Amino acid sequence: MIGNWNYGTGRRKSAVARVFIKAGKGDIVVNGKPISDYFSRETSLMIVRQPLELTNHAQTFDIKVNVSGGGETGQAGAVRHGITRALIDYDATLKPALSKAGFVTRDAREVERKKVGLHKARRAKQFSKR
């Protein structure tokens, strides 16, 4: 994928997305499938399209995405982050608007590890006074 493609890497939770954009008619392909087939939830589709709609480029680019790891929400967030970075690679003047919307910042929240002696990361056994 060399030539007139712009590239961006996005990450969210344990998902990693590699995003390639080029001038086109608005087709988005994720792991070889159309976006509406890959993401089943409407919220995931909305999350992915946010940077394109904010910059009025929804019908301007063809986008190819390779995404792995995580679940549906994490992958959608990773794709959004990757699209944002690819748009900035294409046109740096879009960065202030995307930054203001919070799409440029990587969401650094990760799953907290489970601790020994607890049920989950923080959930302890029920305390009984008597």
Swiss-Prot record:
One GO cellular component from the entry?
Answer: cytosolic small ribosomal subunit
The UniProt entry, under InterPro entries, shows: Ribosomal_Su5_D2-typ_SF, Ribosomal_uS9, Ribosomal_uS9_bac/plastid, Ribosomal_uS9_CS, Ribsml_uS5_D2-typ_fold_subgr
- Name listed for the protein in its UniProt record: Small ribosomal subunit protein uS9
Citing just one GO molecular function, the answer is: structural constituent of ribosome
Pfam families with a match to the protein in the record:
Ribosomal_S9
Keywords, sorted A to Z? Ribonucleoprotein, Ribosomal protein
Q: Give yes or no: UniProt keyword Nucleotide-binding.
A: no
Q: Which PROSITE patterns match?
A: RIBOSOMAL_S9
Q: Which GO terms describe its biological process?
A: translation
Provide the family line. Answer: Belongs to the universal ribosomal protein uS9 family.
User: By its UniProt entry, which SUPFAM superfamilies does this protein fall under?
Assistant: Ribosomal protein S5 domain 2-like
* Classification of source organism: Bacteria, Pseudomonadati, Pseudomonadota, Betaproteobacteria, Burkholderiales
